[in-house]
């Protein structure tokens, strides 16, 4: 989505809401709801090892290097164009696996407006996913302006509204006096530390991706040193509140062993509305959520692809990837994205469980995106050495030890998330462990490989040109 005009300077609240709009969603709440009360300890751990470090790193980089390009510009400044391209490619590639998770949420929500049993029908899910995926891809060909208008409406109806409803209906359920599905006890707060029980923790990063958005808009504020850190702090508070309350209320209402990772949000709506004898509201609400989800998806179809096309025009990728239509849309990248996303969507047909398919795609998404975040943490450390004289309106406190602590903890969080993604979760039937791990590893490698392949081809082309040049 396009940045605001330079004359429209952003304040703390406006900048914070940009972050909140890009992060808050009810779609990923079922993952943490599976943990019951122990989710509180896991949330605290994730906030400490990822959310706080990435927020601080984005605040420093965004205010020190407030230029267009975001993560690409930061990583390029630290490690050069090739590594910067790897970072922006990871942002593009992770969307290929992420799109089917959003589309499955949309399809499952729409099922509650037609027939709730369709939410577990694989054929229905895949057909609806592909129709909406290519439909939104076609809409994205209209350019950034069209995508931004659609996305503004979709962000509210597709992400923020469902999250608000999860919290509101969950609270209404408890205030009515209904019994919680997870009775409180001190022991329930302690998570099981078996690896297969902690596997979902690898995907919690998806609840917090996007916190770097405030850093992207640092140049659109009057006083980045004050505005960006405060906006990030406010966005963190709002995001954590929604995520924790939403996950808790879902766990209160739905039995843990019955929570679907795909349709858990609509299951909560249906269950609570039934207790209030308001079942008639389920279908129209499902329709609003589904339409909002489609609208929310549209700008994301275009955004990362546009970033890759800009880098391609700088000569760091094949020139054809940088070609655009009259609306400035990189058609080739959208087609490749559509074909690859469609292949990933077919996982819902191959894997026995809908929830397992959803989780595998979420795990691949997390594994690819943590590579980008790891580069951000490495960049904030390296730039303290290579560009120490650049003014930093916001500086991670503690000097070099402080930036090493924040960056080091963030890198550790990224590594942990990456490795946990390969562990089959005990909450799901994943089949043969070796096949599960192999599929995830293969998907992650295939999605991350192109930048290295492009670099190798360019190196060989350079050698060929040098060999044929007259001496």
PLM region spans:
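Helix-loop-helix connectors at the membrane interface of multi-pass transporters/channels
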Residues: 1-5, 73-76, 103-127, 161, ...
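Membrane-interface "cap" regions at the ends of multi-pass membrane proteins
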Residues: 1-58, 65-68, 184-185, 389, ...
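C-terminal membrane-solvent junction of multi-pass transporters and transport-like membrane proteins
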Residues: 6, 150-153, 157, 320-327, ...
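Hydrophobic transmembrane alpha-helices that form the core helical bundles
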Residues: 34, 52-133, 137-141, 290-310, ...
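Helix-loop-helix junctions that connect adjacent transmembrane segments
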Residues: 40-41, 118-124, 153-286
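TM-loop-TM module centered on a large, flexible mid-protein loop between adjacent transmembrane helices
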Residues: 73-74, 80, 112-117, 231-298, ...
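Membrane-interface loop-to-helix entry segments
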Residues: 124-176, 232-237, 362-375, 402-409, ...
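A generic transmembrane alpha-helix motif of multi-pass inner-membrane proteins
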Residues: 168, 364-372, 400-471
């Amino acid at each position: 989505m396009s940045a605001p005009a330079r004359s429209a300077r952003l304040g703390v609240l406006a900048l914070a809401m940009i972050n909140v709009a890009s992060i808050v969603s009810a779609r990923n709440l079922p993952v943490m709801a599976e943990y019951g009360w122990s989710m509180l300890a896991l949330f605290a751990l994730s906030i400490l090892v990822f959310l706080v470090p990435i927020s601080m790193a984005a605040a420093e980089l965004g205010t020190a290097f407030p230029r267009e390009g975001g993560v690409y510009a930061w990583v390029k400044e630290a490690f050069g164009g090739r590594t910067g391209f790897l970072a922006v490619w990871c942002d593009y590639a992770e969307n290929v696996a992420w799109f089917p998770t959003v589309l499955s949420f949309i399809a499952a929500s729409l099922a509650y407006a037609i027939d709730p049993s369709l939410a577990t029908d694989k054929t229905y899910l895949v057909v609806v996913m592909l129709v909406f995926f290519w439909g939104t891809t076609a809409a994205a060909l209209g350019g950034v302006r069209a995508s931004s208008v659609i996305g503004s409406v979709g962000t509210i109806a597709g992400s923020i509204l469902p999250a608000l409803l999860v919290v509101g209906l969950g609270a209404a359920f408890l205030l009515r006096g209904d019994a919680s599905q997870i009775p409180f006890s001190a022991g329930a707060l302690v998570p099981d530390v078996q690896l297969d029980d902690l596997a979902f923790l690898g995907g919690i990063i998806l609840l917090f991706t996007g916190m770097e958005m405030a850093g992207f808009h640092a140049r659109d504020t009057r006083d980045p040193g004050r505005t960006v850190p405060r906006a990030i702090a406010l966005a963190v508070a709002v995001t954590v509140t929604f995520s924790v309350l939403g996950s808790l209320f879902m766990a209160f209402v739905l039995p843990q062993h019955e929570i679907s990772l795909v349709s858990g949000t609509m299951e909560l709506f249906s269950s609570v509305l039934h207790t209030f004898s308001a079942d008639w509201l389920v279908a129209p609400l499902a329709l609003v959520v589904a339409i909002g989800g489609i609208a929310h998806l549209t700008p994301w179809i275009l955004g990362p692809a546009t970033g890759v096309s800009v880098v391609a025009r700088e000569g760091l990728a094949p020139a054809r990837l940088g070609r655009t239509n009259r609306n400035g849309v990189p058609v080739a990248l959208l087609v490749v994205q559509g074909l690859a996303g469609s292949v990933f969507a077919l996982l819902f047909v191959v894997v026995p469980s809908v929830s397992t398919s959803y989780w595998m795609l979420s795990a691949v998404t997390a594994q690819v995106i943590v590579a980008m975040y790891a580069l951000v943490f490495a960049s904030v450390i390296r730039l303290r050495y290579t560009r120490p004289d650049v003014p930093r309106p916001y500086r991670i406190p503690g000097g070099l030890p402080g930036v090493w602590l924040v960056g080091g903890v963030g890198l550790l969080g990224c590594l942990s998330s990456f490795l946990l993604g390969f562990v089959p979760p005990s909450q799901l039937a994943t089949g043969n462990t070796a096949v599960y791990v192999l599929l995830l590893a293969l998907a992650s490698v295939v999605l991350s490989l192109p930048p290295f392949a492009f670099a190798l081809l360019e190196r060989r082309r350079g050698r060929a040109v040098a060999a044929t040049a007259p001496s």
